[in-house]
Design a protein with these regions (language model features):
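Generic signal for short, ordered secondary-structure residues
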Residues: 77-82, 95-99, 106, 256, ...
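Broad gene-expression machinery/nucleic-acid interaction feature
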Residues: 124-126, 141, 211-212, 236, ...
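C-terminal anchoring/interaction modules
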Residues: 1-30, 34-36, 45, 127, ...
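Generic detection of long, well-ordered alpha-helical segments
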Residues: 85-92, 105-109, 266-274, 278, ...
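Intrinsically disordered, low-complexity segments enriched in proline/serine/threonine
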Residues: 54, 61, 84, 169, ...
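Helix N-terminus capping/helix-initiation residues
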Residues: 55, 140, 166-168, 265, ...
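Extended, helix-rich architectural segments
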Residues: 1-225, 229-231, 308, 337, ...
Length: 522
């Protein structure tokens, strides 16, 4: 008789989380929100032909995602230890540079766009840092199971469970590496448990996948432990991460729900309006097909070639000459006029929905930049973006949470001290070491500096620099140094020209720019 397999305690807690998510209808609502954003807005409706879609949800989401994500964030570590002096300043400067390097290495700008967009669509999104290199993975809200679904602060959770689908061979390899017995490894088999997977759950046929859980919890001493489990096998036993006191995760919630750790996105509230706009469009097209074009009407037995009625340029032959007018045998029904009310209602529905969502034409940037200055465009944009100030503030908090998690990970994975490469002005790389006790002694805090970065902001900055140069208020060299690195003007090319000039004798110098005694810019 085969031995009955029992679920692990981790899987049982996961099942309780699934029950909660199902009660909240989280899986279906999230899937529905993503379908409408992606344009699959007639899901479940069967028709002989393609049905029309007027997708105003996607530009609304993309605009709001851009307005939040274009806030250029910079992590700044500071010390709360007044006695730290120059040494504390050096350590904080090294950590700031180290954070900048990791931000670029992990492509956090791109990652943040994805997190913000997912949160805008589904209400909340999560990022998980899973190794000493701070490699990150974006986690769907439906794959996160919290011990307390009313507690918004992840760091106050008793435990957190992350769900994922993994190839069976990879799981077995990890189980063998962790010293599991052969009979336990053989219990790891493919399954079809995709009921909680949102999006395309079609898997490539092969050795199969199985559902896996990452279980994170904090012991009484405040230290984080991890374990991994399938439904019946814990293939990575409980493992403490020495020195790690924070869950290596951060969450971004779009619109917080009252008394809930979850959030509400932009999509679900406007889906009824999107459906009605699509229905109106479909009805108008059907009406146009039925009534907007003239239809031939004829006496069939008096037409010699009825098959040619629909052919362009073909003559229609009649079988009799006893009629007074050919219109008695063959004529057209005039097109019926279409009421404009349906079109007006549809346009008004779409425009009102976009305006109420804060994503009208002005907000979406549908302004001719040739007819307005950069400052004017920015003023209009900033006024339209006022409703997003809460999301921008929460995005700053999200980046701050990431920065605090990074500090904890650095301390945990570098118990002997953190060595940071720092490039000096002369190009020589200096290795600075931060002792492990320094993290506690300095009592580090995080400040996030945010500044918007978008085409119109760049245009306004460069426009101001060009005016100052033209007015002689700055030199050309100062203009080049003041240009941002991502300016549309070729900063590096200008810098190379200046270096070439510096190497030439004074007599061979070309004419100076407007800020250097007149002439052209170069």
């Amino acid at each position: 008789m085969a031995q009955e397999l029992t679920e692990t305690y981790i899987w049982q807690r996961y099942r309780r989380g699934v029950t909660h998510h199902s009660r909240q209808n989280l899986y279906e609502q999230t899937a529905k929100a993503f379908r409408f954003f992606e344009g699959d807005q007639w899901h479940g409706v069967f028709s002989a032909e393609e049905l029309p879609v007027y997708n105003f949800i996607a530009p609304t989401v993309e605009y709001k995602t851009a307005m939040v994500s274009m806030q250029q964030m910079q992590i700044v570590y500071t010390s709360n230890d007044p006695s730290g002096g120059k040494e504390a300043e050096r350590i904080c400067a090294d950590l700031n540079e180290y954070a900048r390097q990791h931000w670029e290495a992990q492509k956090m700008d791109t990652l943040c766009w994805r997190i913000v967009r997912d949160a805008c669509i589904s209400g909340d999104a999560y990022v998980y840092f899973y190794n000493r290199n701070l490699d990150a993975q974006v986690i769907d809200n439906t794959a996160v199971y919290l011990a307390d679904e009313q507690q918004r602060d992840l760091q106050k959770q008793e435990y957190i469970i992350l769900y994922e689908r993994r190839p069976v061979n990879d799981v077995k390899r990890d189980a063998k590496k962790n010293g599991l017995k052969k009979e336990l490894i053989e219990q790891i088999t493919p399954d079809e448990d995709t009921e909680t997977v949102v999006g395309d759950d079609t898997e490539v046929k092969g050795d199969g996948k199985c559902s896996c859980l990452l279980y994170l919890w904090r012991d009484d001493n405040g230290e984080i432990h991890i374990a991994r489990s399938t439904q019946t096998v814990i293939y990575q036993p409980d493992t403490p991460i020495t020195g790690l006191t924070k869950y290596p995760m951060a969450s971004f919630v779009w619109i917080p729900k009252k008394n809930s750790a979850r959030g509400t996105g932009e999509v679900l509230p406007i889906i009824p309006n999107q459906i009605e706009a699509n229905r109106l469009l479909a009805r108008r097209l059907i009406s146009a097909k039925m009534n907007a074009f003239a239809k031939p009407v004829y006496v069939k037995n008096l037409i010699e070639n009825p098959a040619d009625v629909e052919n362009v340029g073909k003559a229609i032959a009649v079988k009799t000459a006893s009629v007074q007018s050919v219109q008695d045998i063959f004529t057209y029904i005039a097109p019926a006029p279409m009421s404009q009310e349906a079109g007006i209602l549809q346009a008004d529905l779409i425009q009102t929905t976009r305006d109420l969502a804060g994503a009208g034409d002005a907000a979406l940037g549908q302004i001719n930049p040739e007819r307005a200055s950069g400052a004017a465009i920015i003023a209009v944009r900033d006024q339209a973006a006022v409703p997003l100030n809460e999301q921008i503030a929460m995005f700053k908090q999200f980046v701050e949470d990431v920065a605090l998690v990074w500090i904890d990970l650095w301390r945990a994975y570098h118990p002997e001290g953190l060595t940071i490469p720092a490039q000096q002005t002369d190009g020589i790389v200096r290795l600075d070491r931060i002792a492990p006790e320094a993290f506690d002694e300095l009592r580090l805090t995080v400040r996030i500096d945010a500044s918007p970065t978008n085409p119109f902001s760049k245009y306004a900055r460069e426009e101001a620099l060009e005016r100052a140069l033209a007015a002689g208020q700055i030199t050309f060299a100062e203009y080049v140094e003041a240009l941002p690195d991502d300016a549309s003007a070729p900063k590096e090319a200008f810098r190379a020209i200046l270096e070439k000039r510096a190497d030439q004798p004074d007599g061979m110098m070309p004419p100076a720019g407007p800020g250097e005694g007149g002439g052209q810019m170069i």
